[in-house]
């Protein structure tokens, strides 16, 4: 449904040029909810604005529903944009118009008749839970209700794609959860493809099917959400995950960690495992079969869209041979193992 091929965006020229996007390839299938995360200034907003050509790429192709938007003339692009709804962090509602009239606005601009506008707006108000707010004005609404109006307005042209630019970052956690539930509901009922950018891992965890990680204008990692939470492939991905899960070794231990193993050290590991493995007596089996003692420093279980994920930080205490055997045993059971460092046994 959405395909970016070698998309780059550069502002300015010469030594002062800013390369906001660098050769981005992205493929979002029809009906998917695809998240893009990254730090502030990484290029997330530029990327999503390139999808509907609010920002025209310096190079590369943007293909939506089989149409290359970068090659369309102004009139064809205007028509294509009807297939691309968009919501933002700020709701951008017209204060002088009611909820109904805000949702109706794009249809008025498209020249839709008043009777057809009513037939299209009322179901959207029902879908977004705003039927009883139809005659109210934005000043009478909460933040979450305003975002629901923005979503309904974005759906008025019956788009095939919804672009979400930090759509929940101005909302409190409870309201964020309700908006995410609404987006999931829209995805299921309408088959809408959703591309969202965010810096909030909770958003990715809650509704995304796949996630991409952008850093300094480059898409450095992309994976199914379950795989990303289990085994992020990059250091930045691990940093995002650990900060979200609050799963870091105690500071006193961090200060003792050494990068390389020695004859009198033992490893400190972060383990991630999912599915049936979560329910197995992992630690007792490991101690029995490999001969190591296991000191659990932190552990937690998360549910990622119905998939159970177990996470643990532990010291494996034993000789180099037994700890090596333990690591091999863990990996043989499809457990993702990250060695954080090594500590002296007599410390």
Curated annotation (Swiss-Prot):
Bilayer disposition of the protein: Peripheral membrane protein
GO function terms (MF aspect): ABC-type D-methionine transporter activity; ATP binding; ATP hydrolysis activity
Protein name: Methionine import ATP-binding protein MetN
Domain ABC transporter: 2-241
Functional summary from the UniProt entry: Part of the ABC transporter complex MetNIQ involved in methionine import. Responsible for energy coupling to the transport system.
Family: Belongs to the ABC transporter superfamily. Methionine importer (TC 3.A.1.24) family.
Swiss-Prot/TrEMBL keywords: Amino-acid transport, ATP-binding, Cell inner membrane, Cell membrane, Membrane, Nucleotide-binding, Translocase, Transport
Oligomeric and partner information: The complex is composed of two ATP-binding proteins (MetN), two transmembrane proteins (MetI) and a solute-binding protein (MetQ).
Predominant place of localization: membrane
Taxonomic source organism: Chromohalobacter salexigens (strain ATCC BAA-138 / DSM 3043 / CIP 106854 / NCIMB 13768 / 1H11)
Reactions catalysed: L-methionine(out) + ATP + H2O = L-methionine(in) + ADP + phosphate + H(+); D-methionine(out) + ATP + H2O = D-methionine(in) + ADP + phosphate + H(+)
Superkingdom classification of source: Bacteria
InterPro entries given in the database record: AAA+_ATPase, ABC_transporter-like_ATP-bd, ABC_transporter-like_CS, ACT-like_dom_sf, MetN_ABC, MetN_ABC_transporter-like, NIL_domain, P-loop_NTPase
Subcellular localization, as worded in the UniProt entry: Cell inner membrane
EC number: 7.4.2.11
Gene: metN
Residues annotated as binding ATP: 38-45
GO CC list: plasma membrane
């Amino acid at each position: 449904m959405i395909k970016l091929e070698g998309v780059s965006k550069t502002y300015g020229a010469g030594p002062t040029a800013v390369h906001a996007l660098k050769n981005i390839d992205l493929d979002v299938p029809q009906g998917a909810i695809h998240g893009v995360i990254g730090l502030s200034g990484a290029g997330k907003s530029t990327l999503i604005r390139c999808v509907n050509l609010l920002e025209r790429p310096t190079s590369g192709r943007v293909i939506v529903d089989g149409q290359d938007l970068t090659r369309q003339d102004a009139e064809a692009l205007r028509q294509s944009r009807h297939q691309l709804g968009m919501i933002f962090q700020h709701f951008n509602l017209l204060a002088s118009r009611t909820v109904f009239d805000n949702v109706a606005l794009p249809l008025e601009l498209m020249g839709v008749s008043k009777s057809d506008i009513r037939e299209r707006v009322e179901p959207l108000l029902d879908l977004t839970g705003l039927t009883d707010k139809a005659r109210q004005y934005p000043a009478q609404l909460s933040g979450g209700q305003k975002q629901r109006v923005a979503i309904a307005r974005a759906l008025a042209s019956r788009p095939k794609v919804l672009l979400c630019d930090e759509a929940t970052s101005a909302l409190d956690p409870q309201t964020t959860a309700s908006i995410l539930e609404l987006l999931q509901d829209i995805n299921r009922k309408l088959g809408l493809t959703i591309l969202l950018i965010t810096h909030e891992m909770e958003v990715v965890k809650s509704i995304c099917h796949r996630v991409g990680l952008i850093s300094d204008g480059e898409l450095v990692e992309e994976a199914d959400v379950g795989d990303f939470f289990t085994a992020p492939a990059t250091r930045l991905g691990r940093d995002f995950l650990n900060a979200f899960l609050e799963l870091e070794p105690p500071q006193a231990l961090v200060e003792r960690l050494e990068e390389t193993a020695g004859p009198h050290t033992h490893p400190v590991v972060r383990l991630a495992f999912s599915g049936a493995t979560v329910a197995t007596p992992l630690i007792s089996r490991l101690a029995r079969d490999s001969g190591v003692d296991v000191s659990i420093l932190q552990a937690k279980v998360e549910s990622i869209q119905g998939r159970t994920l177990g996470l643990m930080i532990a010291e494996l205490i034993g000789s180099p041979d037994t700890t090596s055997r333990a690591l091999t045993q863990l990996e043989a059971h499809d457990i993702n193992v990250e060695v954080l460092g090594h500590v002296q046994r007599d410390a």
